[in-house]
Regions:
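Short, glycine- and charge-enriched coil/turn segments that flank and shape catalytic ligand pockets
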Residues: 19-22, 38-50, 123-131, 175-179
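N-terminal phosphate-binding loop and adjacent alpha-helix
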Residues: 29-62
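Conserved NTP-handling cores and scaffolds of large molecular machines
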Residues: 19-21, 59-62, 66, 108-112, ...
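Phosphate/pyrophosphate-binding loops at sites that engage ATP/ADP/AMP, CoA/4′-phosphopantetheine
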Residues: 55-70, 154
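Gly/Thr-rich phosphate-binding beta-strand-loop-beta motif of the actin/hexokinase/Hsp70
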Residues: 1-33, 70-77, 173-179
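Short, glycine/acidic-enriched capping/hinge loops at junctions between secondary-structure elements
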Residues: 15-17, 25-28, 40-44, 84-86
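Active-site neighborhood for divalent-cation/phosphate handling
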Residues: 71, 75-174
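Amphipathic alpha-helical transducer elements in NTP-driven molecular machines
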Residues: 10, 48-56, 97, 144
Length: 179
């Protein structure tokens, strides 16, 4: 069982997928209005008990015990998350990893906060030889930690944490059997 959980501005959304021979099958889904509609979900500023209760109620409606979820996929969004597509030299994985920290500081404003940085390679750049296109992602460590703490408070074991644009791309790639 894979649980996808999206804590959005107006709704908390969840889907449950089971792996089948042909891919995945949607077996359950749920939707719940957030505790204070139209309030932006900001992991750094939320009243955690409100959100914990709302997600737990949704899980109860869906008959899901958070402690039994083996594969949880969530995403971060909001003003403390930055995503930027950049073009960089094609290089070995180890060098690319080191290079991304430098590139993040150059391309993504993080107001001096300690950042959590990740990236995803889109592929070769069609216009420039020996260059690749990369999605560079950064958020504050405080945002990441607050999201993880929220998930733990609900009873989940945090799994994959994406940012919304990358989550959409990964879902599309996975559904269409793309690399």
């Amino acid at each position: 069982m894979i649980l996808g959980l999206d804590i959005g501005r107006q709704y908390i959304k969840a889907v449950v997928l089971d792996k089948t021979k042909g891919g995945h099958k949607l077996v359950n889904h749920g939707l719940r209005l957030v505790p204070e509609p139209n309030q932006t979900f900001d992991p750094e500023k939320i009243s955690q008990p409100h959100w914990v209760m709302a997600v737990r109620e949704l899980m109860k409606e869906m008959k899901i015990n958070p402690k039994r979820v083996k594969h949880l996929v969530t995403s971060l969004n909001g003003s403390h998350v930055s995503v930027k597509q950049i073009t960089t030299m094609d290089m070995p994985q180890e060098e690319l990893h080191s290079s991304m920290t430098f590139e993040a500081r150059k391309h993504i404003p993080m107001d001096g906060s300690e950042a959590v940085i990740d990236y995803q390679i889109f592929g070769s750049n069609p216009k420039e030889v020996d260059k690749i296109d990369v999605a560079l992602v950064a958020c504050t460590k405080k945002t990441s930690s607050a999201h993880i703490e929220l998930l733990k408070e609900i009873g989940f074991k945090p799994g994959i944490i994406d940012v919304d644009p990358i989550a959409i791309m990964n879902s599309y790639s996975y559904a269409n059997d793309l690399p």
